[in-house]
Amino acid sequence: MKKITFIAILLLCICSLTKAKEKVIEQPPFIAWTSTSIQVDKVVLSDTATVLYIKAFYHPKQWIRISGQSFLKDNNGETYALRSGIGIKPDTEFWMPESGEGEFRLVFPPIPTSATSIDFSEGDNVQGAFKIWGIQLKGKALPELLLPQEAIVHKIDINDELPEPKIEYKDATIKGRILDYRPGLVSKIVPIIFDPVKGAYESEEVKINNDGTFVTRVKVPTTTSAAIRLFGKMITFYAVPGEESSVIINTRELCRQQSKFHKDDKPYGEAVYFGGTLAGLSQEYSNCTLKTSILNDYRQLFKDVAGMDAGAYKDFIYGKRANLLASIEKAPISKALKAVLGNQVDAEAAQAISLTEMVIKQAYTMEHKMSKEEAREYFNTAQIELPENYYANAFRPLASINTMAALYNSKLSELIPYYLRRRTDELTKAWGTDKGIYFDINKAGELYSSIKEFTPLTAEQEVILATLPPACQNEVRDANNQLLKTLEANKKKTGFTINEVGNVSNEELFSSIISKYRGKVILVDFWATWCGPCRMANKAMLPLKEELKGKDIVYLYITGETSPLKTWENMIPDIHGEHFRLTDAQWSFLGDKFDIRGVPTYLIIDREGNVKHQKTGFPGVAQIKEELMKVYD
């Protein structure tokens, strides 16, 4: 009996010693991450392993994946390769449950007790890699952050009026600094410019210096909304012609605000400190939590308006507008911000009114639970009865979008080309004029659209351009001059081939297209010139195509008649590969054959002509390479 008792005590002591060697850090604070999709719930340190307990937050029935090349790096620079996963298999899809929340563990070698923090990374060669920096191992606080002198919080005067926007086509300087920066955190940023003439676009990539600073210049025609997307957050500010705007980005606070585990912790200061022109307004706008959106939930909108006619729908939209404007008016914010937010509400109301017939039809199909075929037939044949002068009357109260305040509204860059351009006559009737900033921007935007489609300005268009403000004239002429240079340069470019499909039946079309490349691996890209993700993907693929140069891989691009011929002809010189442009009937047939639901859609064809992989949406360079190599090898 004594012997049994002794053994039991000995085992208990051994267990206690083993347990004592474990250190558990619950929900450790961290400095930065690339995604909110994986978050560290706890870290368990022992002399045999380091285990990260991960909580995953992602779309239900979608997957995430952890690279087998993942590693930890401690603050001393030592790295520790991933050993295994518990509840997840590295390099294999982890499917999210209905709740959109999952959990698993990642096991690494033990880390010395001298380490105070670790970084987790899937590596720089993984597209969209998960990375978390500065995971703390010694307590619940991050190291103290010393703010630079220029990181100030501006005092807001609620009586401040919105200043007149500066209208001039000139460089705006954008400067910034990322706090807690270290090489590898992020190497570049891409400012987004909400240009009222060109529409929203991404400017050139800006390199971040080793001290976390960056600077760039962007030509804008007026005071313009701009933004930087960083660490999952959109940082908005104003770019002003001939002037400087600056942002100091508090990385740890920006990420803390998005953390499931730390969002209620004490703040680390402001997420962003604004400087330069309109810094106070940028700060106030950034911190504002007032709702200004009428169309934030289309599905709910369709439910709300089911059974309404056009008049009732208009009243419903104006009811929502009135509620939003009332909440803005009561808010303790500056007159300047009230003007900006009010203009955004009116822009959304105008968008909603422009969609009257579509919304009523969609609400009807959902209410009656129509099939796709039934809904398509209904959309093509149903006529929504509109009261006389419906659009003119409905747009009449929204004249604020024809005032200078609209130039502060980032929604303007989308509202005009996509929703209101076809309603110009009704807007003229509604407001009793065809003059004003809205009409100037609309005309300039129309001229720019033809340039964007690789069509230089005509003599008639030059006459229209001459009637516009000098800033609009200069921006459009600058774009036209750049186009003329591009067209001339395209004449000398090689590396692309325009192919004809010949006289073949639809059933033989695809096999005929790929037949001349038999014996090679083919990456087929169904794309369109108007498809932004397609164009971004083509640019992203350039380094991979260079890396695989010399291998028996053919890059085959297929588009349809929705890609304007001239635009297509002048875009493909920069897309090396084999190009085909199909008729609408041919495109539709292949769309049905391969069940293509959107562009870009990729097929990978083996050397015998068999489809081995299909994916809609650009999956990233790394995954395309992986799938190509599976077939190639």
Which residues fall in each region the model found?
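Bacterial Sec-dependent N-terminal signal peptides
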Residues: 1-24, 631-633
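Short, well-ordered beta-strand segments enriched in hydrophobic/aromatic residues
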Residues: 49-59
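Short, solvent-exposed, Trp/other aromatic-anchored flexible loops in extracytoplasmic proteins
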Residues: 81-126
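A non-transmembrane, solvent-exposed segment enriched in polar/low-complexity residues
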Residues: 86, 134-336
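Oxidative protein folding and maturation machinery
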Residues: 251-519
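Conserved redox-active cysteine motifs that mediate thiol-disulfide chemistry
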Residues: 518, 526-543
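Structural microenvironment flanking redox-active thiols in thiol-disulfide oxidoreductases
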Residues: 536-573, 586-592, 626
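Thiol/disulfide oxidoreductase modules built on the thioredoxin-like
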Residues: 585-629
